[in-house]
Swiss-Prot record:
The gene coding this protein: rpmG
Keywords attached to this entry: Ribonucleoprotein, Ribosomal protein
Pfam family, any one: Ribosomal_L33
Record has Ribonucleoprotein as a keyword: yes
Protein name per the record: Large ribosomal subunit protein bL33
HAMAP family: Ribosomal_bL33
Region entry Disordered, spans: 19-40
Length: 65
């Protein structure tokens, strides 16, 4: 029987979208990206700086469950 792979699919969510009022946003909602990470190399939660289309700027996106 094959072992589980070390790479898993994770979802990244914008940290600033939830705190900004909807009047300042370009559109309603929260920016989310999907990516893969290696479970052995990065055991902690992933944080990447990505473009948030809701706020129209670069923001920090954190891994969610």
């Amino acid at each position: 029987m094959a072992k589980k792979g070390t790479r898993i699919v994770v979802t990244l969510e914008c940290t600033e979208s939830r705190t900004v009022p909807s009047s300042k946003k370009r559109s309603a909602g929260v920016s989310r990206y999907t990516t893969e990470k290696n479970r052995r190399n990065t055991t902690e939660r992933l944080e990447l700086k990505k473009f948030c289309p809701e706020l129209n700027k670069m923001t920090i996106h954190r891994e969610i469950k």
